């Protein structure tokens, strides 16, 4: 089992589950989340419904991973909405709660072990839009998924 880095779009993966970080506000407005919203409207709807249920205390979602089944054309595919940040913004601040992202990834890793899933996620998950430190997040991934096959997908030039 290994963590490997691949070049290209995470949606080109043949993994069983694709993880990405989401905020707790019900907004998938940029990055991989926006692509999830466009490719898999049912994932977005279920995400919005969960956020609406927690609208009075959105931070209560932090650390959760919402796993939604979709059909990726070739086989059953799952999308994991990892609640690693409460709010969002584009001002260069850190929005990712590394602890919350870690909790969500631990849950995904447990499911991957149980069902023998291969996992894919964007390279620098929680770091590009969310502002977390990549070295810290990479260590969490290495430890959490030490016995699970994981692909980190890096878009060209990123």
How should each PLM-predicted stretch be described?
Residues 1-158:
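Macrodomain-like recognition of ADP-ribose-binding/processing modules
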